[in-house]
Amino acid sequence: MRVVDFLKIDDANGRNAWFLRVDPEDITITLRDIIDALSDLSWISQFDKSYLRATYQTRAEATVKHICQKIQEGAASGVYGDAAEYIVSEVARETLVEHLKYKNVPLGELFKEQVSGNPGFDFFTSNLSDIVIFGEAKYLAAKNAYGSGMSQTARFIEEKRDIADIADIQNFFSDSALTGVYDGTKGFAIAFSAKNTSSVTLIQNIRKNAHYENLASYSELIFVAVNI
């Protein structure tokens, strides 16, 4: 994977909005790396309590098997379908961890309690100021998916899904970071599949989106365009 663009897109009135564009380059290697990353459950060992380790192990093993099977099926057929949003989500998560040095928290589906329907945000991290970032990933086969990601993120905020997610993420973040979430000190990352549209045009369209002003009012807003 290669970060091809990293730009600050808005700093008016203290705003902190960023745009990254990631090119997976060799998709075969990228998919193999994603499967390896998902299969690495060493993060479970950080928890002192045996019952927590057992809980996360049980949740993660079945989910990893399911996701990896979807990715492998997509790689074999060239049609990624259900696997595509997992790919966008994991590429974005790894980019924030490796490029920005943000907190390495496993993909949400590996540790969150499974809920019917859409359970909430897809991935989580915190920045160097210990502010929790809630991540949403969207894939569309025919067009850039930033609009769908912004719309869903705005809806999740309105429905207080970020607050609801605190119960699932509390063991990965500090008390002060979680208190900040409740008090409004938090950020959002929107990862989306990108086509051949230039980054300049993507940024212009993102800033014109009806949800942009509200989303940019939070402590940090990050867009991660994934060329897939």
Regions flagged by a language model, labelled:
Residues 125-134:
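Active-site beta-strand-loop-beta-strand hairpin of nuclease catalytic cores
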Residues 137-197:
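Catalytic cores of nucleic-acid endonucleases
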Residues 1, 79, 99, 153-158, ...:
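Charged, terminal alpha-helix-loop-beta segments
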Residues 119-121:
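Short beta-strand or tight-loop elements
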Residues 95-116:
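A short acidic/basic microdomain associated with nuclease active sites
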Residues 172-228:
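Domain-level recognition of nuclease-like catalytic cores that cleave nucleotide substrates
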Residues 1-90:
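Interdomain/boundary linker segments immediately adjacent to catalytic/signaling cores
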Residues 98, 129, 140-143:
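Short loop/turn segments at secondary-structure transitions that flank enzyme active sites
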